[in-house]
Amino acid sequence: MEGHKAEEEVLDILRLNVGGCIYTARRESLCRFKDSMLASMFSGRFPLKTDESGACVIDRDGHLFKYLLDYLHGEVHIPTEEQTRVALQEEADYFGIPYPYSLSDHLANEMETYSLRSNIELKKALTDFCDSYGLVCNKPTVWVLHYLNTSGASCESRIIGVYSTKTDGTDAIDKQLGGRIHSKSIFKREAGNNVQYIWSDYSVAELKKMMDAFDAWEGKGVSYWRVPHELIECWTLEERPLLGSLSHMAPIRKRRLIVNEEEEEGVNCKTGPKPVRFLGPSTSTQIKVKNSASIRVSPASAPQPWPRATANLAAGGRAVQRSAQSKVPTPVGTGLPEHPQAAQGPGAPENGATHLPPAKVLLSDKTATPHRVIKLRRTPLCATGSSLPACTTPRPAGPPEPPPDALSPLGTWTENGQDQTK
């Protein structure tokens, strides 16, 4: 019993002598395609021709048979040379094996086989396949909407529009028909991807008698019929290919919506100059400095007293005494010496608080560039009484002269005009 089973297993593995090339193959693989010549040869219904070693002799090209044998085992090797591919196709036709000529043929065969086994529509299988690669199945076609009506001896035929998708064409038909699309007088028929609407008072049987080749309509062009006495209208949405070669068309990649975060990441990943973004005005009068006492101010750019603070100090008699002793250059950002009035512009913060003129802070060794002039509107700091006339005293033509305390590198000016040293 065991010897009989072993003999059957040995018979399932066959030795082949194809054009002098020796191969070993399973009977099941050779009979993979039921309608092929190999399946008929090794089905057991016909005697096999063998050589001295017992191998089955097949008088064909042994080198090309290797491609077919690998294909029967589930492997596909497509030759690169055109001459070899043509010769291989002849061998495949001789044995009745659907060997693919190219990779696209192989994918098409596998897709059709998968659709039949899984009971899935081929179009959906192709769509899923393209979705896996982020591609869209596209064919260069347009949809043409024809209109035709006949009444007695008159006939009118025209094109309503050309559309890029069938959905746009269907919407155009709905717009043309309006409420008549659901009428009993409307007859709809389809052929392939094309659709036709016929409006008349005739029944379908009567239309078949009047219209030429009514049942043989394949959706191509407009169907003409024998001229009846009643009015008949016809709308035909036909798919037409664009002129040109498909070989030059590249696959269209799917468009996807990019989230703002992804777009920001994509912009940051790019090299080169980044786009300039508006972050508000270049200057701001709402500047608050914390721990201002710890900021070291350079002597050359020490804050200068403004006219109202000078007038307040002039009440004590010190400003007049120091006016001819020293001349300090104008600080950066307070205007030009020829235009002293530029430092007293009407611009001011909304809360009306008094701010100090800008000072050059030594935060680094880099040379500070001149800033824009900040025009501030200041409230009077003068008290009532004897100091009141000093506020209305006209300023001298030149820039105000500071007291010697203003030249102290450690001094800072407060809002009331007093010097505060650390």
Curated annotation (Swiss-Prot):
SUPFAM superfamilies: POZ domain
Chain ranges passing through the membrane: none
Biased composition, class Polar residues, residue ranges: 413-422
Region called Disordered, residue ranges: 289-357, 376-422
Protein name (record): BTB/POZ domain-containing protein KCTD18
PANTHER family associated with the record: BTB_POZ DOMAIN-CONTAINING PROTEIN KCTD18, POTASSIUM CHANNEL TETRAMERIZATION DOMAIN-CONTAINING
Organism: Bos taurus
UniProt GO BP: protein homooligomerization
Xref: Pfam families: BTB_2 (PF02214), KCTD18_C (PF19321)
BTB domain residues: 12-80
Compositional bias ranges of the Pro residues kind: 396-406
InterPro entries: KCTD18_C, SKP1/BTB/POZ_sf, T1-type_BTB
